[in-house]
């Protein structure tokens, strides 16, 4: 896999520039594997991704999608942004407001709680442009319950040797940042969001800028946090969120041929 988990290369406006191509290829320089890949989740939501892949790949790549019950997914997503200091509205308000707006390309605030869970809506484009034999669907629920079997099904899909044992998989833990404002200021500085950071290239050498950026990225002070134990979703809100996704999940089952038995909300 790429040395950077989510390169977001194929979403870039200037993805064909020599600089972007070289940086992307460098993410795989240490790989001696027959198969390489990466895991940028936002590719699922950008139509340009499919157009660009079809244009530049003679042979279709393979896609593995890990889907989670959309009700649980959006609630976890909400608390993730709360912990980062990027959300202060109630969950119900955040979700319903998102459902009322159109989806558009996003940057530092990926608060599409409703839209990200419209799996059938997003996957239809993949099934329309690539053969189903090149698309693998697994669920987070199956990955947690039977990780070895689920991962081996992916290995089989990729035509590589299956595993006999598997080390425990550590799940992501929702946290609350101790200094969220400093954390986001740091991220914006690194991304060059402020005029002063854009102007700095005329005052500081590229080598010095790279050094400072690396120091900021590795400074754990900005990422200081503690576990965030959030409340369970109420039955009333759970029923409401379910109603938003019922038609999409029904279409998802038809599209993929999967029953999604682990999603109890949609299999009563």
Q: Where are the model-predicted features located?
A:
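Anion-recognition interface
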Residues: 1-268
């Amino acid at each position: 896999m790429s040395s950077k988990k989510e390169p977001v290369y194929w979403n870039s406006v200037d993805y064909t520039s020599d600089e972007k191509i070289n940086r992307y290829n460098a993410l795989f320089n240490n790989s001696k594997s027959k198969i390489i890949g990466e895991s940028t989740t936002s590719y699922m939501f950008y139509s340009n991704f499919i157009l660009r892949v079809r244009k530049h790949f003679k042979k279709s790549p393979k896609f593995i999608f890990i889907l989670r019950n959309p009700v649980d997914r959006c609630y976890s997503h909400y608390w993730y942004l709360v912990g980062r200091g990027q959300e202060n509205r109630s969950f119900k308000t955040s979700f319903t407001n998102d459902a009322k707006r159109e989806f558009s390309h996003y940057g530092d605030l990926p608060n599409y709680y409703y839209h990200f869970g419209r799996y059938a809506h997003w996957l239809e484009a993949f099934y329309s442009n690539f053969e189903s034999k090149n698309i693998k669907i697994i669920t987070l629920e199956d990955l947690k319950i039977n990780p070895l079997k689920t991962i081996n099904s992916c290995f089989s899909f990729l035509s590589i040797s299956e595993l006999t044992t598997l080390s425990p998989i550590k799940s992501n833990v929702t946290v609350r940042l101790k200094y969220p404002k400093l954390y986001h200021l740091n991220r914006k500085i690194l991304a060059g969001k402020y005029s002063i950071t854009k102007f700095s290239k005329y005052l500081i050498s590229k080598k010095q800028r790279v050094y400072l950026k690396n120091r900021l990225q590795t400074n754990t002070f900005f990422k200081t946090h503690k576990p965030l134990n959030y409340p369970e979703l109420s039955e009333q809100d759970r029923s409401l969120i379910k109603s938003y996704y019922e038609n999409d999940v029904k279409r998802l089952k038809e599209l993929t041929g999967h029953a999604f038995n682990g999603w109890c909300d949609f299999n009563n």
